[in-house]
Design a protein with these regions (language model features):
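Class I S-adenosyl-L-methionine
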Residues: 1-7, 12, 17-113, 118
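Beta-strand/loop-alpha-helix module characteristic of Rossmann-like adenine-cofactor folds
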Residues: 1-5, 107-108, 116-155
Length: 155
């Protein structure tokens, strides 16, 4: 079984209770570089594998990470894939569940707090407000071609 767990953004205590419990019980912890390293201490008996990726600096390819998830799950190990923020907000969680489905590996998702929500909130800025904004948009600074549209309006 593989659990894709969002670590939240920033401090270790922003992870969900469910995410923390899974870290404590897992056999293998496969983690990104953007997590608070204090979370690693909760996986006392787990095999810990860093697969951290940042723009332009990848310790492992996504294909290698996907294969590692499948390999460890096929060894009948409980695997936590710990990702910064939320697994499905620019976290490649979608790519990982596609690989798990193709490998016939059971999985579950534990959402995390995305910086897209947390940063403005911690600064006291609501991302929506009934009187001024009914929606908000999250846009990456990186595209497949590393080019943002020139016609994107700023508000």
């Amino acid at each position: 079984m593989v659990y894709l767990v969002g670590a939240g953004c920033g401090d270790y205590d922003l992870i969900t209770l469910r995410g923390l419990e899974l870290i404590k019980k897992c056999d293998v912890l496969i983690y990104d570089s953007l997590i608070d390293k204090e979370l690693l201490e909760y996986a006392e008996n787990a095999e810990k594998i860093c697969v951290g990726k940042r723009s332009g600096a990848h310790s492992e390819t996504q294909k290698t990470i996907n294969s590692l998830l499948i390999e460890k799950a096929r060894e009948n190990k409980t695997v936590v894939r710990l990702k910064g923020g939320d697994p499905f907000v620019f976290g490649r969680g979608g790519e990982e569940i596609i690989a798990l489905k193709e490998g016939d590996i059971p999985f579950d998702i534990v959402p995390g707090i995305s910086s897209a929500i947390a940063v403005p909130e911690l600064a006291g800025i609501p991302v929506t407000h009934r009187l001024t904004s009914r929606s908000f948009h999250v846009i990456t600074g990186h595209t497949a071609e590393d080019i943002l549209p020139e016609n994107m309006k700023a508000y």
